[in-house]
Structure formats: C-alpha cells, structure tokens
Amino acid sequence: IIDLENEHFDYGMAGEGEFSFLKMVEAILNNDHNEIMKVPGLVKRLSKGEYHINPNHRVHDLNLLPRPARHLVDMEAYFKIGAFHSAKSRSKRVLSVMCSRGCPEKCTFCSTPSMWGQNTRWRSTEHIMDEISNDVRDFRIGEIQFDDDTITVNKKNLYSLCDKLEKVGLPWCTPNGTKVNYHFKKQDEMYK
C-alpha cells in the first residue's frame, strides 16, 4: 500500500484491481460516495491517521482479463534498455507473461500468497498463446519470460503450454524460478 500518511493520497487499491479500479473510477466520476466506499479492495484516507480499507477482490477466471495493452506502451524503450528479469536473457526483445496467480505454499520470504492468494488460478493455454502470438508478431519478440512463481504447479496446464510453445520456436525461461519439489521426471524433456 502506498504511503497512507501522504496528504495527496485520497484513494488506492489493494490486491487485484483490474475490475475494482474501474468500479472506483466510475463511482468517482458519478460522485457517488456510497458506491465508492463499497468497491472491493478500496483504500481511502478518511482523516489524519484514519483509513477505510475494504477486503480485496480475487479475479477467479483469469480468462476474463484482456491481453495487456502493450500497444499503448513504448515497447521499444523497454527493449532498448533491456527491461527484463533474467541475467541470462538471449534477447533484449523480451515478452513478460503471467499464466497464473496464487501459490499454495507459505514461504516466509515470499509475498505471492498475500498478493494473489493461496489458490492457484490459471489462464487457459489458448488465452496465453493468444497474447504470445499477437505480441511476438507485433513486437518481434526474441524471448518469452514467464513471471509466474508457480508455473510448474499444474502439470496438465504446463504440458499443454509447452506443446504450444514448441511451435512458436522462441527461447523461454522462468526468471522467478520454480519450487524444487514441483519438478517431475518429464519436465527436463519439456525444457529442451
């Protein structure tokens, strides 16, 4: 959460805000204070030292989320500076993709369960590949980086994704790493 003591702060959003933020903006534009205060994940500074914080909202069906609007961003600027996670990237033209949210683990060093919850939710392979194929075409991508913390949790989805990625023919990696006990015998074959 941003600095709640900052006097320039009126509203904020905690958790997954894709849909809640839109509700908040609509309520503000309609000057509807009652609706503003009902928005899931709303953080509002009431007065010095007092805050209103609503429970956040989880997006259960990640396929409802639109593809990232990368066409509205200066992607060439990102590519120029090499804004990516892995020190071993093979290209500066990196596409960062999230396939899932959540993690069933409770690692003391990690904020993923707090941010995304402990139930892992996956986008469909088709939804993921739609994003990848469009952005590979539009931005001449040279490498794909999956930023999921638990991309190897769901074997069925991972196998399906790997089958589709093979046809794309680009190198890919998981710069956030994977949990060692999620690895399984066939996984080495998939990473080749």
Over which residues does each language-model region extend?
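Radical SAM [4Fe-4S] cluster-binding motif and immediate context
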Residues: N63-L64, A69-K192
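Glycine-rich beta-alpha loop elements in corrinoid/cobalamin-binding modules
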Residues: I1-R58
